[in-house]
Amino acid sequence: MRLSDFDYELPEELVAQEPVTPRDASRLLVLPREGAAEHRAFTDLPDLLAPGDLLVFNDTKVIPARLVGTKPTGGKVELLLCEPLGGGLGSRWRAMGQASKPIREGTTLLFEGLEARVEASEGEGFYVVTLDREGEALEAALARAGRIPLPPYIRRAPSDVDRERYQTIWARAPGSAAAPTAGLHFTEAILARLAARGVERTAVTLHVGPGTFLPVRGDSVEGHRMHAEQYEVRPEAAAAIAACRARGSRVVAVGTTSVRTLESAWRGGAVAAGAGRTALFVRPGHAFRAVDALVTNFHLPRSTLLMLVCAFGGTHRVLAAYRDAVARRYRFFSYGDAMLLARAD
């Protein structure tokens, strides 16, 4: 497969720069297994799912992970906390650092009262750092000193609005440097309607790292390597998925991160409870085992996220739907509109 196989033309003005208000006021492109696409509102989602279907959310919480501070010399430094090492909101992190000169091991960086000691350089701008606090104290320090790490295609400074809107309403586990954006459309009213219809829900956790935005280098898709991310499937989620399968209902993943979590946790014919790290690269040819339908946003041309969606819905059908969405002026990427896809195979 060539990278160019996953390209499409997108006018810059269709890249959503602000969230819609309210959250569920977005559009929904429905791509069934067969037949023409439908153009609906996201508020129609409960009517498009069946009683007994199971929605699987990612309950990770975006942290204000972008820090701007100084080195002991007074020079400016930026740090993006990418992945907690050891689980939870601990003190050791993998981070991306940017300064006028390479940051030396042993250097202590200062961020409005929060200190980070550089323990090791991993190359390509990545470092292992130890912060001077953890848990609730760290969460409070990041709320004060950190900024929400908006994606690079949102060409404005983060605002206080983003602290609320670049976060799902069910976010529970702090640790992500990017939001699981398919979940941003859901409101309490939508969840109540889903419950009234008999649609069930559960949650898994995958802490999204900045690798989600890194481009595929070269034109050969097979040579790309994903950055590993931490995930967890709790026993109650595994049990809910098994019960859904047993009654013949659909597992509906909310977002590509939920797909990667469930496919990574597949063991011996079922989704297994447990925690680990996954670098699973889902692309056309992947045999999906855990997921029947997918709610997702529109993704960047040539991105690994688009490749996952093409693998799930069929490359030709998905790219045709994207071209249709462009023609109909859908809004794209993190703050954009959504799709509901049935699995192609």
From Swiss-Prot:
Enzyme Commission number(s): 2.4.99.17
Signal sequence interval, chain numbering: none
Organism: Anaeromyxobacter sp. (strain Fw109-5)
Superkingdom classification of source: Bacteria
Localization per record: Cytoplasm
UniProt catalytic activity: 7-aminomethyl-7-carbaguanosine(34) in tRNA + S-adenosyl-L-methionine = epoxyqueuosine(34) in tRNA + adenine + L-methionine + 2 H(+)
Gene3D superfamilies from the UniProt entry: QueA-like
GO biological process terms, semicolon-separated: queuosine biosynthetic process; tRNA wobble guanine modification
One function term, GO molecular function aspect: S-adenosylmethionine:tRNA ribosyltransferase-isomerase activity
InterPro entries reported for this sequence: QueA, QueA_dom1, QueA_dom2, QueA_sf
Function: Transfers and isomerizes the ribose moiety from AdoMet to the 7-aminomethyl group of 7-deazaguanine (preQ1-tRNA) to give epoxyqueuosine (oQ-tRNA).
Keywords recorded for this protein, A-Z: Cytoplasm, Queuosine biosynthesis, S-adenosyl-L-methionine, Transferase
Metabolic or biological pathway, per its Swiss-Prot or TrEMBL entry: tRNA modification; tRNA-queuosine biosynthesis
Description of how the protein assembles with itself and partners: Monomer.
Annotated family: Belongs to the QueA family.
Source taxonomy: Bacteria, Pseudomonadati, Myxococcota, Myxococcia, Myxococcales
GO cellular component, one term: cytoplasm
Protein name according to UniProt: S-adenosylmethionine:tRNA ribosyltransferase-isomerase
